[in-house]
UniProtKB/Swiss-Prot annotation:
GO terms for cellular component: cytoplasm; small ribosomal subunit. This is Small ribosomal subunit protein bS16. Keywords: Ribonucleoprotein, Ribosomal protein. GO terms for molecular function: structural constituent of ribosome. One of its GO terms (biological process) is translation. It comes from Thermodesulfovibrio yellowstonii (strain ATCC 51303 / DSM 11347 / YP87). The lineage of its organism: Bacteria, Pseudomonadati, Nitrospirota, Thermodesulfovibrionia, Thermodesulfovibrionales.
């Protein structure tokens, strides 16, 4: 199964995330299929950049977004 989830980057106490499409069995920061966005929770307000065209493509192909990514998609779509 393919999932849309967050990949953690940045330094200690300063997280920065990539929104990636990856196999569900792959490690959090392991191999991924495609980068479809970024999320920076440390800015005010938190910065979310998603390529909605690719998000919709992968969801149509059967990819399951994680709970956090679902919330980010809702925030961008609103």
């Amino acid at each position: 199964m393919v999932r849309i989830r967050l990949m953690r980057l940045g330094a200690k106490k300063k997280p920065f995330y990539r929104v990636v499409v990856a196999d569900a069995k792959a490690r959090r920061n392991g191999p991924f299929i495609e980068i479809i966005g970024t999320y920076n929770p440390k800015t005010d307000p938190p910065e979310v950049n998603l390529n909605m065209e690719r998000v919709n493509y992968w969801i149509d192909k059967g990819a399951q977004p994680s709970d956090t990514v679902k919330k980010l998609i809702e925030r961008v779509s609103a």
